[in-house]
Regions:
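FAD/FMN-dependent oxidoreductases across multiple families
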Residues: 101-102, 106-176
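Predominantly flavin-linked oxidoreductase catalytic cores and closely associated redox partners
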Residues: 1-121
């Protein structure tokens, strides 16, 4: 009970876009040695929230990128806050998964970041509408595996197309 047999995929060409460190992607990279001669991949965890804020706190088009605080010097975390239309802001925080402190809570770091004097005023009196978290692949071009193999191709985070330094993930996934 509860078991369902897998399916056979039969196609001339299959596009695999299952996200960061996807199960099939890992198997395909290993089977076809798509990462041969590449640097090891690096991973992070990212948190994102969408807020509805007061009209007087909203500056449509404003973009804030930060790095560092509240993370320790040896934990290169980064964050963003984007003012969108309709008095909404998108904010996020990314922490690499190779952090040294076993007591570090990336979620708590994100919550602390929102109290910074450059961030808090925008959120005061606002309401969080949605939130989420996900794994991120952030090794860069030197870690990017070959994306094509016999009968298929890897796309997006399955291949590692995120440009972490420029915070370009959706853009590069669509282009892949």
């Amino acid at each position: 009970p509860g078991f369902e047999a897998g399916i056979d995929i039969k196609a001339k060409y299959t596009i695999f876009g299952e996200g960061c460190r996807g199960h099939l992607g890992k198997e395909l990279i290993a089977k076809y040695e798509l990462d041969k001669g590449k640097d090891p991949q690096h991973y992070g965890i990212g948190f994102k929230e969408v807020w509805k804020i007061k009209d007087e706190n909203h500056e449509e088009g404003l973009v804030i990128h930060t790095n560092g605080w509240p993370s320790a010097k040896n934990t290169p975390a980064g964050s963003y806050l984007y003012h969108a239309d309709n008095n909404e802001v998108y904010l996020g925080y990314v922490v690499p998964l190779d952090y040294e402190n076993p007591y570090l809570s990336p979620f708590e770091e994100f919550q602390t970041w929102k109290t910074h004097p450059s961030i808090r005023p925008y959120l005061e009196g606002g309401e969080r509408l949605t939130y989420g978290a996900r794994a991120l692949i952030k090794g860069g071009l030197q870690s990017l595996p070959s994306m094509e193999f016999p009968g298929g191709v890897l796309v997006g985070d399955n291949a590692g197309t995120l440009v972490f330094s420029k915070i370009k993930g959706s853009h590069t996934a669509m282009k892949s």
